[in-house]
């Protein structure tokens, strides 16, 4: 099951005033309901981006992106602001709830609604926009999660951030 689901359970799922119960089943539920959702979204991106040999550094200007891309990016920035505000108040539970909600929207709405864009046989601005948007969202969310899930965040960072930019800091925890 791992340390990250355990850390997520205690830091993000429980409020400080709640009696803490622990079992393998509880941690397995955290892993399957949240951690695996993020991991599967990340795996979807890496699989199709590598198959399509996407140049992730090639940006698509925001006004040229479809409305759904602008929507998820706006939600990502709102998530970052709300998570930062919660962590500045030492409210890990609220920060975790905001992150979980975003990951749910990213996986269950954005990726599912846009699969055809990723699966198109021809390359183009629409496909590049979909990849770039998903990359930006994953890049943001793993950084927000780093204090909660250091191992998962580091794995994603090394594959998304460091692999495309060797000048990037050595660890997600240094960004």
Spans of model-derived segments:
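Membrane-interfacial loop-to-helix junctions in multi-pass inner-membrane proteins
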Residues: 23-32, 91, 126-134
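Composition- and surface-driven signal marking solvent-exposed, interaction-prone regions
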Residues: 21-27, 98-99, 130, 157-159
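Acidic, turn-prone loop/beta-hairpin segments
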Residues: 11, 52-81, 112-175
